[in-house]
């Protein structure tokens, strides 16, 4: 088995309010930055997985995202090789 680097990105679904993103967006002007038109906060997870091949590593990361890394009711996620 080989080690494969995989990335899982998790974001709130567009229709879900993002209070953390709103707080950061509102703070930008007070720090001297131009306001952002849109700002949303998510998670970026980097994994090194032992698997037979890249497809098996992606499938394993997909299962991890579905069951633990993301809440599919309110979050979307993507899985890719690093």
Annotate the PLM regions:
Residues 1-82:
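Long, contiguous binding/interaction regions
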